Every structure is written in structure tokens, then in C-alpha cells.
Amino acid sequence: DYLIALGLTSPFEGNGNDTQAAQEMALDRIKQLSAHEVGHTLGIAHNFAASENERASVMDYPHPKLTIVNGEISLEGAYDKGIGSWDKHAVAYGYQDFASISDEQEGLAKIVVKGRNAGLAFKSDTDTRSSRHGSSNGHMWENGDDPLDAFDHISEVRRLALDNLGLNTLPANAPLSSLENALVPIYLLHRYQVEAVAKQVGGLVYEYERKGDYTTPQGQTFVAPQVQQRAMQQLI
């Protein structure tokens, strides 16, 4: 992450050597990863749909959330701090105490309904990890609730970073050949968002539905035709 941050910001112009933002981004990623692994020790599965709910879970694989401010790439808030609303929901479901079995069944059902009413989405490994899976949501290493808009944004960030990549990316006395180390992750910065876009083509919209969740089962539908067409245009 530190290398990516340097490639995004190229902070060594002239005598410049302010890498504070890059260091903070890298440390925030380590903190997020630590919380992620603690979540696994608690038995919580990956939730790759969390990035579509305002980064609702540390159990996602997060891509740094990058912004452009006054024509420059900002690393502020690249990684979220603390646990998210999905994490609290999962812990409440898994660790809440109830006085009796009947109370437990009723209480757990209420927790599920509360999470659904809050708009919390969940997709885990079996439906999302491979590019062959048909789910149109729940992607690794991406951001936002609209993968096509997110692709346009990360492509603009990538273009700006590549335009600035050069001598200012390297600290003093660094070998020029080491520029390739920063080039590769920046050149491929949009690669995971491309996968999210590709899954819109012929992709399915569905959730993990149980009997009784809805008056009429929701089932599954295909991604809207206009969304699929836009996705194909982006891929081309």
C-alpha cells in the first residue's frame, strides 16, 4: 500500500519528501486487516458486498477509496477506521444471549429483519470470489454501489497518476529502474473494478433468501439491459 500511495501521489518533486499521507494510508490498511482477521477468529465470513454499503464491514477486501481534489489525488480516508454496521450486525446475531430457545429463534429473526431493513447486503466467497460467478454484486477490491460509475472514477484516478508518474515518484538517489515497481500497481489500478464491470454482463441480481423472508419470494433477475450495454461499452 505504501508503494501504491507513492505511485498515486509522486511526492518527491524538487526537494520534497513528505510521505506522511502515504504512511498513514499504509498504516490504516494494516489496522483494517487486523480487524478483518479478528473477525475471522469470531467466526465471521467475508462480506464482499460491504463496500457497496458505505464500507459496512472490515470483512470485505477493501480497495483504497481515492478522490481527486483540485486536480490532485487525495489519500484522505483511503481506508475506513473502526468496524462497520455489518460487523456489529453479525456479532449481534452470533453472540447475543437469549433466555430460551423460543426467545432465541424470535430474537435472531428480528436481527435478520433489522439488518435487511437497514439495507445491509451480504455476499460471500461461494458467490463472488471467482470471475465465473454470476452475482452482479459483491466484488473484491472495489468501491461504491455502482460498479460502472466506480470504474469511470478509478480510471480517471489512474490516468492522473500515470500522467504524473516519473522522477517525482522516486526519492533522492533511487535507481531510475525502480520506477517500474511503482508503475505496475498504478497501471493495473483498475483491474478489480474491470472484473466488477464484467460481472454486470449477464449478471444476476439476488440475495440469500429464506422461506418466509418475503410475502412473495424475490428470486433472481438479470441486470437491467441498459446497465449491461454500458458495461460492455466500458469493457471495449
Q: Where are the regions a protein language model picked out?
A:
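Active-site proximal loops enriched in glycine and acidic residues that flank catalytic Cys/His/Asp
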Residues: 30, 46, 50, 63
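Catalytic Zn2+-binding segment of zinc metalloproteases
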Residues: 38-52
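Metzincin-family zinc-dependent endopeptidase catalytic domain
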Residues: 1-41, 64-68
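Conserved catalytic/binding loops enriched for acidic/polar residues
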Residues: 20-21, 51-236
